[in-house]
A protein has these predicted regions:
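Phosphate-interacting basic helix/loop segments used at nucleotide- and nucleic-acid interfaces
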Residues: 1-20
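A structural signal for small-residue-enriched, beta-sheet-centric alpha/beta enzyme cores
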Residues: 24-134
Length: 134
């Protein structure tokens, strides 16, 4: 990983803008494993120029009920798409272009804390810390 992946993403975004005058979102991507799932999927290690998370709380679900805890991990979802297109083996490509994703572009600086939660809020960490009693 870069020493400061958020700075690296911002530098790439600025270079693209200065060269082409196009506003883009940049997501630096790696692959990850998911508990109880076969295979890898993409994960955003940083981003710039794109809102990383969409707060869906108080929006309606399919039945018209308000959502209470839903945050959509926009850049992680896009990272999975990009990871699939970039590949994992000898065929891998250094970048992917994802268009018309509906992600919200922004000029504000993205902070690493926006894409993470405290360990005590994480269902995986809590589950490991509190194993079921037999």
């Amino acid at each position: 990983y870069p020493t400061d992946p958020y700075l690296s993403a911002e530098q790439i975004r600025r270079k693209i803008f200065l060269k082409s005058l196009i506003h883009v979102g940049i997501i630096l991507v790696d692959s990850r494993l998911m508990p109880a799932r076969i295979g890898t999927s993409g994960v955003a290690i940083s981003c710039a120029g794109v809102e990383p998370v969409l707060d869906m709380r108080s929006k309606k679900d399919l039945d018209g009920n308000p959502l209470k805890v839903t945050f959509q991990a926009v850049v992680d979802n896009l990272a999975t798409i990009a990871n699939h297109k970039m590949g994992e083996g000898a065929e891998s490509k250094p970048f992917a272009i994802v268009r018309n994703s509906g992600a919200k572009l922004t000029d504000r600086k993205i902070n690493s804390s926006e894409m993470a939660i405290a360990p005590e809020q994480c269902v995986y960490v809590r589950g490991l810390a509190n194993p079921p009693k037999n």
